[in-house]
Amino acid sequence: MVNAVNVANVNSVPGLLDVPKINAVVTDNFRAKMVSNTDMIELAANKEAASFEQTILKAFDSMNAKQTNMDKLGEQMIVDPESVDVHDITMGMAEASLSLKLAQTIIDRLVKTWNDITTTR
């Protein structure tokens, strides 16, 4: 005979019968579901490419926005130090510095390439 005291009823345990169904992963329209805060991914995914000039101008506008945002955070830190987190200041300074160095490197490479092209002729 089965000891009725030690036998657990599987139907009475709430978590054992409620198994969630896993749906199949559909990747047909994966790019449409991507969310971006910049237009760069959208431009890269589109068939029509932006001109080189437009790409450079957008990059410089982004760099300028980061520099301006950092200036505003710096002013706010001086006026009301308790309203700004030090971590935000540090991250903003690093991001602005990196974007400025990247822009400087791109300009230097463009000037060097232009000089190489003009001296070869």
UniProtKB/Swiss-Prot annotation:
It holds the Pfam family FliE. It comes from the Bacteria. GO terms for biological process: bacterial-type flagellum-dependent cell motility. Its main location: other. Transmembrane segments: none annotated. One of its GO terms (cellular component) is bacterial-type flagellum basal body. Keywords: Bacterial flagellum. One of its GO terms (molecular function) is cytoskeletal motor activity. InterPro entries: FliE. It is found in: Bacterial flagellum basal body. Belongs to the FliE family. This is Flagellar hook-basal body complex protein FliE. It comes from Treponema denticola (strain ATCC 35405 / DSM 14222 / CIP 103919 / JCM 8153 / KCTC 15104). The lineage of its organism: Bacteria, Pseudomonadati, Spirochaetota, Spirochaetia, Spirochaetales.
